[in-house]
Regions:
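Catalytic center-proximal scaffold of phosphoryl-transfer enzymes
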Residues: 1-170
């Protein structure tokens, strides 16, 4: 049922419960719901939600300002990759005023081709960190790139911590 799928998705991604724990919880409630079935349902939902994701991405990319970042994630079983190899969750935030959206997209690569694909059709101001992977899309699409204040703040903190106490005014 849609409510069962909603519960499984929320439990796994918002609450961080692995599927084997959900399987155990359902078993205690007298229901046989295998983690294999749940995994297949989640994979199938990716296909179901793809048109919605495409629409949200298109709406985001018609805005004049976007934020983008990428972060490492661990994927335990992925064809051709070890669990220790870097994989990436890419996030973009933006959209029309009053209706911003935050989109997450997994990609095993951190190559510059990923933001080129994600930001296809965007022409505005991109706020991102200093990662060089955004340079290609900025150059090809004529984007104005601005820095991330949190990353700038971290550099000041690092400089303060590295400075001798005399330089800190103490």
């Amino acid at each position: 049922t849609p409510s069962l799928l909603g519960y499984i998705i929320t439990s796994k991604y918002a609450d961080g419960l692995p599927l084997y724990r959900l399987e155990q919880m359902f078993k205690r409630l007298g229901q046989e719901v295998s983690r294999t079935s749940m995994a297949h349902w989640i994979i199938r939902l990716d296909e179901v939600f793809q048109p919605l994701m495409n629409l949200l991405r298109e709406e985001q990319n018609h805005a004049t300002y976007l934020q983008a970042d990428e972060t490492r994630i661990q994927v335990l079983k992925e064809k051709g990759k070890t669990a220790q190899s870097d994989k990436w969750m890419w996030v973009t935030r933006g959209g029309p005023p009053g209706r911003p959206s935050v989109l997450f997209e997994y990609d095993p690569s951190r190559a510059g081709s990923v933001p080129v694909r994600l930001l296809d059709g965007f022409s505005g101001i991109l706020q991102a960190d200093g990662y060089s992977g955004y340079s290609q899309v900025c150059k090809e699409s004529g984007l104005t790139r601005i820095g991330c204040w949190d990353h700038a703040r971290r550099k000041f903190i690092e400089a303060t911590q590295a400075a001798p106490s005399v330089a800190k005014g103490k």
